[in-house]
Amino acid sequence: MTGRRKGGEAAVEACVGGPAEALEEAPPEVADLAAACVRAVHRALGVELDYDPDSIPLLDHYLTLLPNRPREPTREPVRGLVAAMTGAYFGEVVRRLFPARWTIEPGGEAVDWRLEFRYCFLAFSPVAVAWEVLLRCDAPDGAAAYFLEEPTRGQVAERLDRLPRVPIDDYYTFAQRLETLVLTAGWLAERVRQSGRSPRPIEPERYAEFFRRLRTPG
């Protein structure tokens, strides 16, 4: 166990859930891919990623250096590994900012792995985000979205729509996705504070039911 890094964003206290918690170990498959990302970036840039949010621009820079980044089908296995590595690292950075857990369903692919916040209902697939950043286009079926319950999802979407438009070159970056995530978590925390309630842990079953319904046609 290692100590959780304090994020420094006062607005997200409700999503953090109180005092700093011990950071649980990541699932082995996530930890291995994130470590592989650290090694790959070190080889390319000579810099050691440290799982700090300030390292995310370095991750974006690393992707710009990859040869043949566009969409040649023959590079699918290579792109898949890069997406899995960088997504795992991105998820681990987020997990050091906010209490969250990885959910890995048996037989699922890396793009299906979810990071689920513990004290506010917010979940996403870091590897799906990585695919969008890597290919610079939206993932099918909204796989890289930040998943929220209704009516919160619509309310957050309205607030995001009121923000200044982001240039396309910035939109498909990990740095921009992290900024949007922090804003979203801050708004969720604001709602909890205004309600006067203390943050309560969200059970895994609530997320599981949400995604079951999402996958059910009709």
Predicted regions and their residues:
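N-terminal low-complexity, intrinsically disordered segments
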Residues: 2-83
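A sequence-level detector of short, solvent-exposed, charge-rich linear segments
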Residues: 56, 78, 82, 112-113, ...
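Extended, Lys/Arg-enriched charged tracts that mediate electrostatic binding to polyanionic substrates
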Residues: 80-100, 192-214
